[in-house]
Amino acid sequence: MKRIAIGFCLLGLALAGAQQRMADRAGQPGGASADRITREVRHELVMLPYYGVFDNLAYSVNGGTVTLLGEVTRPTLKSDAENSVKHIEGVTNVVNQIKVLPLSPMDDRIRVAAYRAIYSQPGLDRYALQAVPPIHIIVDNGHVTLVGVVASKSDKDMAGVRANGVSGVFSVDNQLQVEGR
């Protein structure tokens, strides 16, 4: 008789746990977890065909709402980012706050010169070997912002110095992050 009572208690606890998990999933659209949505959003953004070193895409996930942030050089990249994220299971709303940088021949010249200055520097040239280099160069009306991740503080400082040495640059905002910090 005791064994039967213990068996029913264990069965009741198992059912209560399963019911709690179902309730947790019901609170999230489609049962999708925030971690899974975050991984899929990152994957979709990195896989965009025209996403490059002169673009910066960021995002935040809050429940089923994905907020897209950053700056891009092509208007089509802004809409492509929104469309690729919209179809992820569990995403109910996409807020697109991506800024399209203005067309400017001078900014284009600065982009190319900054790319050459940074990625031709011994020590920083190893970053250029990746499909999407980790140092993103954002140029907006002559103002350069460096965004991304580097291995050391000296790499961060060197990239800032190299970008600051480009002719026509008004200011450099070095927002590079050092791995592990």
Predicted regions and their residues:
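N-terminal targeting leaders
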Residues: 2-11, 17-181
